[in-house]
Amino acid sequence: RIIAQCRWLLPLSLMLVGTISPDIGLGATVVSLAPVSAVHETGVTISIKSREFSPNTVSLIMGQKTRLVIKNLDTELHAFLPVGLMTDSHLNISGNGAPQFAKDGLVRVLLPTSGQTEIVFIPSRSGTFPYFCDLPGHVMRGTIVVHKNEAMIE
């Protein structure tokens, strides 16, 4: 009977999530309806070592959820400044980096020695966005290219 009542759900993409929540009760299962595109996530890691970003060019897809991980493998403090990429965007930032914001969004993240920051966001526009470290004497630069779709990535 339940299957017959839920037949209309079959064409949808579903994600089942098991939880233990004091609000709902132990062992409760929460069903979350989410389209596949919202669940799919691209992961990109930018490492900092010997005062260089690697890779120094990163490709992303507009509208696709992205988990950008920045790892400082150096023995000194560094900064990550994504110019124009994350303005007016919803961000989820975690890790031991220190994010700095302005009224239009993320300005930079300071990364301590062996530090790491994860930024989850959805690129909202295509284009080429530089990123760099603005600490004195650090001439580290890179580029994030946001493509309109996967077919545009070489």
Protein language model regions, located:
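Bacterial N-terminal signal peptides that target proteins for export
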Residues: R1-L10
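Beta-strand cores of secreted/periplasmic/IMS beta-sandwich domains, seen most often
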Residues: N56-L81, Q116-R125, P130
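Residue-level signal for short segments within beta-strands and strand-turn junctions
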Residues: P82-M86, K148
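Short aromatic-acidic-glycine turn motif
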Residues: M86-G97
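Extracellular/periplasmic metallocenter environments
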Residues: L26-S32, E52, K103-E154
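N-terminal edge beta-strand
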Residues: S37-K65
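Solvent-exposed loop/turn segments at secondary-structure junctions
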Residues: D74-E76, M86-D88, G137
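Bacterial N-terminal signal peptides
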Residues: L9-S21
